[in-house]
Design a protein with these regions (language model features):
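Non-catalytic extracellular/periplasmic "stalk"
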Residues: 1-53, 57
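Catalytic cores of peptidoglycan-degrading enzymes
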Residues: 46-194
Length: 196
């Protein structure tokens, strides 16, 4: 019986390693598309921030309008109404709501970046894209506003990975310039993952 358990454990380990190897091979084939799709830049120009105001991602916080504790699944960038909003990675527009309350988000854009990533841009004043449209990193997709359940002009930005909201701050380097980011991405594209 002990030998069968050991063989079973070995078979499971080999299976997991083969799945991981298959994923690595697929990643290698798709690395350029992945590097362009993963949300990785600031959704607004940092110089547009009011007093460097960035509201935190939080599992629980006091909602400023509703007055009770609930999750805050994104981060908020305090800025003037009309500030340009950029796609943070290559994607297809899944939702572009140019009117309505939309569950408190107001006017919003939801981008599908593939590879399990989506990003949401909410409380917009103006939506500049349409569902089904392909957008590229750095493209202006909207302008900030104060629509929906909001206390003032800002951008609410979410990163959703495999259906779960994750902290967007982990997806961009606050000190990295666009040029530095492009150099990093170029180095990643030149890396041969098949030899790792």
């Amino acid at each position: 019986v002990g030998t069968w358990r050991q063989l079973d454990a070995l078979a499971r380990t080999l299976y997991l390693e083969s799945v991981s190897f298959d994923e690595l091979q697929q990643f290698s084939k798709n690395k350029e598309q992945l590097s362009a799709a993963v949300p990785a830049i600031w959704p607004i120009d940092r110089s547009a921030l009011h007093n460097n105001h960035i509201g935190a991602f939080s599992a629980r916080r006091m909602h400023p309008v509703l007055g009770y504790i609930r999750p805050h699944t994104g981060i908020d960038f305090g800025c003037d109404r009309g500030t340009p909003v950029y796609a943070t990675g290559d994607a297809v527009v899944e939702t572009a709501s140019a009117s309505g309350f939309n569950g408190g988000y107001g006017k919003q854009v939801l981008l599908n970046h593939e590879f399990g990533y989506k990003t949401r841009y909410a409380h917009l004043n103006e939506v500049l894209v349409k569902p089904g449209e392909r957008v590229t990193r750095g493209q202006i997709i909207a302008r900030t506003g104060n629509t929906g359940r909001s206390t003032g002009p800002h951008l609410h930005y979410e990163v959703i990975h495999k259906g779960v909201p994750v902290n967007p701050i982990n997806y961009f380097n606050r000190n990295m310039t666009p040029e530095e980011y492009e150099r990093l991405m170029e180095n990643m594209r030149e890396t041969n993952f098949e030899k790792l």
